Regions:
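Short pocket-lining segment of the protein kinase catalytic domain that shapes the ATP-binding cleft
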Residues: 94-101, 110-111
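Protein kinase catalytic-loop region centered on the HRD/HxD motif
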Residues: 142-155
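AlphaC helix of the eukaryotic protein kinase fold
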Residues: 45-69
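Conserved N-lobe ATP-binding subsite of Hanks-type protein kinase domains
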Residues: 27
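Short beta-strand micro-motifs within the conserved protein kinase catalytic domain, predominantly
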Residues: 77-92, 100
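Activation segment signature within eukaryotic-like protein kinase domains
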Residues: 138-139
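Conserved N-lobe loop of protein kinases adjacent to the ATP-binding glycine-rich P-loop
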Residues: 31-39
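AlphaC helix of the protein kinase catalytic domain
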Residues: 104-130
Length: 155
């Protein structure tokens, strides 16, 4: 029953197109905004937490992160945060820019889009180790982003 309800998510001013990812605390959906721009929408469900306190703590964290998300080049820009209006299955959501497409970093095809990740880069390398310089660059950018979050009391 929960998966049927979850497939009918309503995000204001967005047409939810398809699920593109997920993890322990939520699902990521592709959606089209009223301007036509494709976005990623992370939906975090209350039922995925042991208690209300943990759910609300995570919501407070994203509220704190949203205004600073645009202040550092290593962070994903949060464009909007909101709460779902389903009292039986409470959730909150946040709208983000889509990450690079594994097939093309410029044009997003809503049917074929697949997020580019370190895993997809490793798979594309077909067993050839990733360039050391690339790995150092990624590691440095991650460390700088994490340091910034620590400075803002978010990590």
């Amino acid at each position: 029953m929960a998966s049927m309800i979850r497939s009918e998510i309503h995000i204001p001013d967005h047409e939810v197109l398809r699920k593109i990812g997920g993890g322990a605390y939520g699902e990521v959906w592709m959606a089209r905004g009223v301007t036509g721009a494709l976005r990623a929408v992370k939906v975090v469900w209350r039922e995925d937490f042991e208690d209300e306190r943990g759910f609300e703590r995570e919501f407070e964290g994203i509220l704190k992160f949203e205004p600073i998300s645009r202040d550092h080049p290593g962070l994903v820009n949060i464009l909007h945060v909101g709460r779902g209006n389903d009292s039986e299955n409470p959730f909150y959501y946040y709208v983000m820019e889509l990450g690079d497409d594994v097939h093309s970093s410029r044009e997003f095809n809503p049917v074929e889009y697949q997020a580019r990740t370190l895993r997809s880069d490793l798979k594309a390398s077909e067993g050839v180790p990733l360039d050391v310089g690339f790995c150092i660059d990624v590691g440095q950018r991650l460390a700088e982003s994490l340091q910034y979050l620590h400075e803002k009391d978010l990590a």
